[in-house]
Amino acid sequence: MAAKKVFGSAEASNLVTELRRSFDDGVTRGYEWRVTQLKKLMIICDNHEPEIVAALRDDLGKPELESSVYEVSLLRNSIKLALKQLKNWMAPEKAKTSLTTFPASAEIVSEPLGVVLVISAWNYPFLLSIDPVIGAISAGNAVVLKPSELAPASSALLTKLLEQYLDPSAVRVVEGAVTETSALLEQKWDKIFYTGSSKIGRVIMAAAAKHLTPVVLELGGKSPVVVDSDTDLKVTVRRIIVGKWGCNNGQACVSPDYILTTKEYAPKLIDAMKLELEKFYGKNPIESKDMSRIVNSNHFDRLSKLLDEKEVSDKIVYGGEKDRENLKIAPTILLDVPLDSLIMSEEIFGPLLPILTLNNLEESFDVIRSRPKPLAAYLFTHNKKLKERFAATVSAGGIVVNDIAVHLALHTLPFGGVGESGMGAYHGKFSFDAFSHKKAVLYRSLFGDSAVRYPPYSRGKLRLLKALVDSNIFDLFKVLLGLA
């Protein structure tokens, strides 16, 4: 067996130097280069979907539907949009000028940042790797992708496919774990895009600060679901289930983390959830082929610890079965766990779902407000005033009313966090903007130069300049006519 190549600080430095040379030579800036790379990404999606599905099955036990729809199809949509809109995105945006600069014209130019680093996550290893790369390439950057070592089959396939199809002078993949990531983070980048936990997000931000490198941090948090009694119970329950257990078995950054409802309504909600869960996954959901497994034994043990805590284990009202050998945990519903328990203190990122009961739904706003701002917040209700208040007053990366997680499929909406759930946003044109510098450009004429801005200064010049800067045409005429 060949020895694994060492990738340390020297190798990372050489890599960045090579890519920066390509960027400085203008390799990535042209429209044709960008389009060519995007089309090759589409070929990867079209020609290698079975391999992608197989890799996701190896890494996470994902069912084919989840892999094809939530990873490959979403990537196709992102690529199609970029190919369709790229000329418009690249075109300078006209900007208004003022009396102060007359005669002049102005525009905002989207300029590529340079050499960027994308560090992706294991839970959606293709979507969360390639989607930011689409934005980086569309914006004209050279890019290094560091996929997650926790999804080894996906990481290996990503490396193989991107090396096979994309321009190696400007797009590279670095596999590895902490050593390789640390070596990459020592380098000076023009932007770092990270998807993962807030714990590692802090490490990324600290490393970026040394070089004043801007970052996009796509993190997570405890995304709440508020369920009003004035709702369609069956539809509500089905959407919560598919948004929780039907999205990588709860291992998703926008997964429902806990439910808030009233004490009176909770029994109906729980009974309905039990009924639909059995319809979806059978009497023994651990054996269901339609549910992903836990990514590895470390995460399995972490989730088991949340579930086995003394004040929590007796709160299970559904599920709780575990199979460590096959890394399976059944969908588990818990009722009224303590607010200071581990399960309510950290992001769950798995198939456990606490339900907290309240005297009235008004209290849900206080519970959400008392915690760090989540990546997503969800509400199920027919009540128009409640919808409006929730959208207006709950601070989260995104709000969805009467569904779960579907907002991330809309390229017209920015996807990103706020506060501890992240910073920056992407998807659609927001991805292009995330990897662009919006450069202000002003064109002035050398004709019609006025002495009013030059010394020696006078009261008349002061009045005239104030009128110009204020863009007050009436005052300007008064000054010119000697009336002011």
From Swiss-Prot:
Phenotype when changing I200V: Also able to use NADP(+) as coenzyme, but no effect on the interaction with the substrate. 15% efficiency with NAD(+). 70% loss of efficiency with NAD(+). Loss of cofactor specificity and same lower efficiency with both
Annotated control of activity: Thiol-based regulation. Inactivation after dimerization under oxidizing conditions.
CDD domains: ALDH_F3FHI (cd07137)
Effect annotated for changing C45S: Decreased solubility, loss of dimerization and strongly decreased activity
GO biological process per UniProt: aldehyde metabolic process; response to abscisic acid; response to desiccation; response to salt stress
Catalytic activity: an aldehyde + NAD(+) + H2O = a carboxylate + NADH + 2 H(+)
Binding, NAD(+): G196, S197, S198, K199, I200, G201
Phenotypic consequence of gene deletion: Increased sensitivity to salt stress.
NAD listed as a keyword: yes
Catalytic site positions: E218 (proton acceptor), C253 (nucleophile)
PROSITE patterns: ALDEHYDE_DEHYDR_GLU
Enzyme Commission number, as recorded: 1.2.1.3
Tissue-by-tissue expression: Isoform alpha is expressed in expanded leaves and flowers. Detected in seedlings. Isoform beta is mainly expressed in flowers. Detected in leaves and seedlings.
pH relationship of activity: Optimum pH is 8.0.
Result of altering E149N: Ability to use NADP(+) and 33% decreased efficiency with NAD(+). 70% loss of efficiency with NAD(+). Impaired affinity for both cofactors and decreased catalytic efficiency
Role according to the record: Involved in oxidative stress tolerance by detoxifying reactive aldehydes derived from lipid peroxidation. Medium- to long-chain saturated aldehydes are preferred substrates, while the short-chain aldehyde propanal is a weak substrate. Is strictely NAD(+) specific.
Stored PANTHER family: ALDEHYDE DEHYDROGENASE, ALDEHYDE DEHYDROGENASE TYPE III, ISOFORM Q
Subunit composition and interactions: Homodimer and homomultimer.
Protein name: Aldehyde dehydrogenase family 3 member H1
Source taxonomy: Eukaryota, Viridiplantae, Streptophyta, Embryophyta, Tracheophyta
